[in-house]
Structure formats: structure tokens, C-alpha cells
């Protein structure tokens, strides 16, 4: 007895089924050595487009945003440092 799934045949050939394979059947993998494909040279000329100049408005916005993020991070660190400054740091000696 057993479940029906265990009685179903395995979809891939087993060792025993491989022995039963007829000589006329082609193997799954060719016996030739698989070589990597080499890219064929292409004589297509592509125009290299220069990226548009950086917009000063975007640079100023990015700088201001990074300054705001840095300021908020420092303020958060200072608040946590004040809150937990009296708790000693214990370095673990174990792994």
C-alpha cells in the first residue's frame, strides 16, 4: 500500500531504464564537446551620444536633500546617545 503519487513513475530515466535504451535512440546530450559561442564581428557604426549636461537645479536639490538626511541622522544619533549614555557597553568575549 502507499499513496498514488509514490506509485507513479519517475519522469526522468533511471539507471535501469538507461540500460534498456535501444542503440537506435539518440542520447539526450550529444557526445560532442560543447563550445562557447563566439560573437561574430559586426561592422555597424553606432553614434555615441553624449549625455546631456547636468542640470544645476537637480544638483542643488540633491545636495540640499543629502544635507537634510545627514542633519536628521545626526540629530537621531544625538537623541539616542543622550537617552542611552548611562548604559555601559559590554563587549562579548565569546563567539
Swiss-Prot record:
- UniProt modified residues of type Phosphoserine: 40, 92
- S-palmitoyl cysteine: lipidated where? 3
Any Pfam family from its record, for instance, is SmAKAP
**What is its subcellular localisation?**
Cell membrane
Lipid linkage positions (N-myristoyl glycine): 2
Q: How is it modified after translation?
A: May be palmitoylated at Cys-3.
GO CC annotation: plasma membrane
Where does the entry say this protein is expressed, by tissue?
A: Expressed in heart (at protein level).
Q: Region labeled PKA-RI-binding — which residues?
A: 56-74
Q: Which domain of life is it from?
A: Eukaryota
Molecular function as annotated in GO: protein kinase A regulatory subunit binding
- Record key words, sorted: Cell membrane, Lipoprotein, Membrane, Myristate, Palmitate, Phosphoprotein
Record flagged with keyword Cell membrane: yes
Asked if the record carries the keyword Membrane, the reply is yes
This molecule's function is given as: Binds to type I regulatory subunits of protein kinase A (PKA-RI) and may anchor/target them to the plasma membrane.
Instruction: Name the family.
Output: Belongs to the small membrane AKAP family.
Q: Which PANTHER family match?
A: SMALL MEMBRANE A-KINASE ANCHOR PROTEIN
Query: Self-association or partners: how does it assemble?
Result: Interacts with PRKAR1A and PRKAR1B.
Name of the protein described by the UniProt record: Small membrane A-kinase anchor protein
Tell me which species this is from.
Answer: Homo sapiens
Give the gene symbol: C2orf88
